[in-house]
Design a protein with these regions (language model features):
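Nucleotidyltransferase catalytic core that binds NTPs
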Residues: 1-173
């Protein structure tokens, strides 16, 4: 039986913390779907398609920063989008039995536990919470955007493709 998991997030933008959670999850499951989702509570900087491309461009670079994905023979990584509908429906459609969520602190856990219960009720999907690496646990996409918008260096927190995209978006604002 193939063990399929979904790692959902807005990934706006993708950070090394996101890549670390994805790589660790990919070692636990036969197939991992990194799913770019629309969060109605947020106004995205990048379109869903741009975020998918940034993730694709960043995967090869991940190893340079100590994030290693398992060989493709051991785990398949799929990058997809969900711009509408329920996450539970997506899980059912792709045959996923697990959601993967990264948690940085107690606030994240307080947010994720009720969501986990709803996803289990709606689709029978269990949620696995993976603690963030302490070196990346304080980094959020919002913080990265704020620092980049003010001209600060974010190279320690995001892959080079994301750095370039942030610089380009700052010029267009």
């Amino acid at each position: 039986m193939t063990r399929i998991a979904v790692y959902p997030g807005s990934f706006d933008p993708l950070t090394f913390g996101h890549l670390d959670i994805a790589a660790r999850a990919a070692r636990l499951f036969d197939e991992l779907h990194i799913l770019v989702v629309h969060n109605p509570g947020k106004t995205p900087r990048f379109s869903s398609e741009e975020r998918v491309e940034l993730i694709r461009a960043s995967l090869p670079e991940a190893a340079r920063f100590g994030v290693s994905f398992p060989p493709s023979s051991q785990s398949k990584v799929v990058i997809d989008t969900l711009d509408g509908g329920l996450l539970a429906d997506y899980c059912h459609r792709v045959g996923a039995s697990v959601l993967v969520k990264g948690v940085r602190n107690g606030v994240d856990i307080d947010y994720e536990v009720p969501m986990a219960r709803v996803n289990r009720d709606l689709a029978g999907v269990e949620t696995v919470l993976i603690p963030a690496d302490p070196q990346q646990g304080f980094v959020s996409s919002s913080l990265v955007k704020q620092v980049a918008d003010l001209g600060g260096s974010v190279e320690k927190y995001v892959p080079s493709a994301v750095v370039r995209a942030l610089r380009a978006s700052a010029k267009n604002q």
